[in-house]
Every structure is written in C-alpha cells, then in structure tokens.
C-alpha cells in the first residue's frame, strides 16, 4: 500500500523564504522613510500654530515677542511630540506684497519634542527653517535647512 505525502518539500519552503526576504529588503527602507516623513510633517503643524503668535508680535513691529510667561506672552516656541518649533528672524517693515518675505522665520528642530528617543534616526537633530511671507504662508529656506529634501512637507516646497 502506498502512502501519500502531504505538505511542501524543503526546496519549495526555501523558495518562499527567499521571496519573503527579497520583499522585506525593499519594504523596510521604504517604511522607515514613511515614518520619517510623517514625523517631519508634525513640524509644519507646529509652525501653523505659531502664525497667530507671529501676527500678534508683528503688531508691535517684531517677529519674536516677550518670552516672559509672567507678562502674559505665549512665548516664542511650541513643542510637539517629535519637534520643537521656535520663532526667529527680524521683521522687515518694507515687505508689502504677498510674495515678499516679512523677515520672520520658524526654526523646527527634530528630536527636541516629548517623544525623546522614539523619533526616526533619519531626521533626529535636523532643522527645517521656514520663511514667512506677508500673506502668512511659509516656504522652506534652502540655505538654512539641513533636513533632507525628501522629508520636507510638500506644502512648503513651492
């Protein structure tokens, strides 16, 4: 009486393991880039939150306000989970049209948020510097930013 074999041969199993290994070799770096991009996007959210503070400070003719909390000021920075956004720059009173820089900047430093060591190694310690325009929009400053271009949110690239 013949016995029927059921299951996979060793060669078939080795081929499946090799295919999974090849797929993982491509998927893991792509996933790491995805995580870094999503963490870098938090910086833009923090910068948007600082727009109101910058507008308030501009009424007194400066980008940065009094950083003394006792005076009722909200301060010049905002801390998120992965980044710290800080208002910087000197107000340009001559800027009038919407496409001119008003002199104010937001410096976003990754790795100084509340998450501590849980930030992607691809962006930790990097800076994204955003110039603010008269109309309130931001554009990244190519000369002062050391964050890789692929991690900079598209909203500030144009």
Curated annotation (Swiss-Prot):
Cross-referenced InterPro entries: N_methyl_site, Pilin, Pilin-like, T4P/T2SS_Core
GO cellular component: membrane; pilus
Propeptide: 1-7
Cross-referenced Pfam families: N_methyl, Pilin
Residues recorded as bearing N-methylphenylalanine in the entry: 8
Membrane topology field: Single-pass membrane protein
Main subcellular location of this protein, as a coarse class: other
Disulfide bonding pattern of the chain: 63-104
Keywords: Disulfide bond, Fimbrium, Membrane, Methylation, Transmembrane, Transmembrane helix
Amino-acid biosynthesis found in the keyword field: no
Family per record: Belongs to the N-Me-Phe pilin family.
Protein name: Type IV major fimbrial protein FimA
Gene of this entry: fimA
